[in-house]
Amino acid sequence: VFLRDVSQWSQLLLLLALVLVYLYNFRVLDLERVPYMSGIVKNVYALINLGMAGFVMATITVRFVFPAVSAEGAAFWIVRTAPISLGDFLWSKFWTGLVPVLVLSETLTVLANQFLGIDPFLKVASAVAILFMSLALVGLATGLGARYPRFNAENPTQVAGSYGGVMFMILAVLFVLIACVLVGWPSSLYLWHRARGVALSSSQQWTVWLSFATGAALSLVTGWWSMRSGVRALEEMG
């Protein structure tokens, strides 16, 4: 459906153009004018970039992943009679959406952080965070898209603007904000202590790793629960 719909291609090209402009702004950003603050400012920008990448993911998934089930239209009955389970059907939608979203988001994050020249620790933390955020947001979009389908919609834009699409965006924004806090706070704590040449205490180390683990667990649970809820909703349609 995506390949046959010219309007979706045009919207995707527009999105890619905006991403290029976004990256260019990081490329020409001159933080060396404030040498005493450049290190701190770079890391702050990196955390802002993580949040922006999360919001970009939310925008992409609500536009291209959330309508995936609804795009089957009246032909969905064929899926129900096909020799595959509805779970396999929905997970195929998940993996199809995950790959491009993950590649685009990781590229956006890695390149922006490279242009900023941030600390290697924060580079790795951001890349790993994007991986887990992609799993959660694609799972959330696919699951809610199955729970609130609109098989009679004329185009994917109507699906994205439906009740389910609005609910997804609200939940996605809340998730991105929570994820940024769970990644940003411990990362800032670690970098602040390292800049001062002071080692983290044992309790602080546990707090840092607990925060990272909580973020990873929240992402996996969000994606898995959403997919499970979506499969159950499809099964109840019959």
Give residue ranges: language-model regions:
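Hydrophobic alpha-helical transmembrane segments of membrane proteins
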Residues: 1-77, 85-238
